[in-house]
Amino acid sequence: MRVSWISGLLLVAHLAPSSAFNPLRFFLDDTFSSGATEEHFMGPSDDGFALQQPTNYDPSMPFPLDESASAAVDAVSNNYIVMFKPSVDKSKLEQHHRWIEHLHEKRSLDFKDVSTFLMKHTFEIGDAFLGYAGRFSPWLVAELQKHPDIALVEPDRVMHVMTEQTFAPWGLARVSHRKKLGFFTMTRYQYNETAGEGVTAYVIDTGINIEHQDFQGRATWGATIPTGEGEVDDHGHGTHVAGTIAGKTFGVSKNAKLVAVKVMRADGTGTVSDIIKGIEFAFKQSKKDKESIASVVNMSIGGDASTALDLAVNAAIAGGLFFAVAAGNDAEDACGTSPARVSNAMTVGASTWNDQIASFSNIGSCVDIFAPGSLILSDWIGSNRASMILSGTSMASPHVAGLAAYFISLDPSLANHPVELKKYMLKFALKDLLNGIPEDTPNVLAFNNYE
């Protein structure tokens, strides 16, 4: 048995989503647009290209066109995310992109139109998510929406981090005690010493202060997705989250490794397309990692509903990655935000030290579990010893990501089976202890099953 004492209180981290900047939220959005009216590039013809006429998109397909997103307040002008139907083979990507270039060149010649065409990202996450993102003129977007191979054309949007600075720490104790915390248990964290050993946690966020002494050299820099950004957490949100997952002092899984995947800028905003690219990196890197028995992901970010983002998360989960995601900080239905509404992810709401639902926490049937998210102390930026107290579902989610790593280290048969792992964690979670939970919201509190 291992008991960790933290001066004052113990803490847990958590993240939450939103569509407009709010100190309680962590959103990200960057818009991309693409459109196509003709189908496949088939080869030379009279004018050098032969284009098949498109057919209408079949509404019975599982991924509908998301036209409602075009009116999103945080949409980035002329930036879109484009997804192919599941039936499209990745071998067709090159000819599809050549087809777009041909359309663009032909338009420029025919209409003397100096229009926008900039490819930003291509996406490939397992067998279920194939697409790209970029900046495209409205006429090209219209063409893409009619293309028979395209399942989704969605505006890229801005998201933000979801946190609120507050006063004091407390949370690790709560995830290791069955009963409500009291004087003698408030600062007592009970856990098995394996504590995430052999598991890697990908923190898709603002980055990590990897030199912080609390990480003991177990944190590395994985990828920087936004253009013009450096390999540094210049916001602090990601470092705080990482500390809750695997910090020596503040972490649930004190032996897990951490990988920084920076998708958010210093102001706490980022684009959906950059987030999807970060998910792709974590997925592919986890497959290359032969040293870890499994990997988990924490995403304490979110915003307005995004079909593209939801599908990217689902594809990674189908490929074996566990995702803990923040429910959001708007005290509203989490089913209206992404990625909180992803059914196979573990969506985390925030609770307080006295077992109340946090006033800001999102609610509803899409919330799977609650974890400490109010007044959470964890690691910070500015020095290799810095700490900070924050509140938010962004602080709650890392508690659950840490617990996922913890349970995998105890039972390696759970590795690479995220849906089964989620069921396992819900099985041992504490039921009907929280106050203030609406009837349509599961009354479930994260627990490490140590007692």
Swiss-Prot record:
Keywords, sorted A to Z: Hydrolase, Protease, Serine protease, Signal
Residues in Peptidase S8 domain copies: 169-451
Active site: D205, H237, S394
Keyword flag Hydrolase: yes
EC number: 3.4.21.-
Biological process annotations from GO: protein catabolic process in the vacuole; zymogen activation
N-terminal signal peptide: 1-20
GO terms under cellular component: extracellular space; fungal-type vacuole; fungal-type vacuole lumen
Gene3D superfamilies in alphabetical order: Peptidase S8 propeptide/proteinase inhibitor I9, Peptidase S8/S53 domain
Gene Ontology molecular functions: peptidase activity; serine-type endopeptidase activity
One protein family per Pfam: Inhibitor_I9
Ranges for domain Inhibitor I9: 80-161
Superkingdom of origin: Eukaryota
Keyword Protease: yes
Enzyme class, broadest EC rank: hydrolase
UniProt-listed InterPro entries: PCSK9_ProteinaseK-like, Peptidase_S8/S53_dom, Peptidase_S8/S53_dom_sf, Peptidase_S8_Asp-AS, Peptidase_S8_His-AS, Peptidase_S8_Ser-AS, Peptidase_S8_subtilisin-like, Peptidase_S8_subtilisin-rel
Family: Belongs to the peptidase S8 family.
Record-given protein name: Subtilase-type proteinase psp3
Name of encoding gene: psp3
